[in-house]
Amino acid sequence: MNWRCMVSIKVAFVALTLGMAAGAQHPAAPRDNHSAEFRAMEQKLAYLKLNAAKAHPDPKPTELTEAEANAYFAEGGVKLPKGVSQIHLASRPGVLDAHAKIDFEEIMQGRGSNNPMYAMFSGKHDVEVVAQASGAGGTGSIQVQSIQLDGSEVPRWALEFFVQHYITPKYPNVGMTTTFKLPLRIESAAVETGRVRLVQR
């Protein structure tokens, strides 16, 4: 997976918790007239890449803020998979709260249309994901706590069914609990209020 997507999605998070952003293989084409927050995020990602290339990376923490991450998504910093849009992230200690517009027709592409469970995950919905998130020892972990569709919480059994049948087959490393190797020699990722602190080693 492209390093920009790994940092901005797997460390910051909505779509990964749904299993969607794992398909974002490449950053979107650059555009002019970006916000200061977008440019700050871009500079920090470039720094992380350069620091990772050093024999001994500077362990000084790099902070990615909510405003920077949200601007990066909103202004096309990451080419999202079909069916995922309008990502907005918020955080508090150890927890990520992510909102997105999800078009399940685009995601499922007709699969499972004869299954009664399909009705719950059809059409376009406003989705909110709350997940515990952390990173230590070079490994990141995201554990989904709850998901709401249009303000109504999805029963856990229904969510597990959807993930098992429509997400994991396409993205084998994604589930209700997802662990992954942090990119760019990131040793730890601490989710705090309004920011994520990354340490490289």
What is each model feature region?
Residues G23-R201:
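Extracellular/lumenal and peripheral-membrane lipid-interaction modules
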Residues S8-A21:
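Bacterial N-terminal signal peptides
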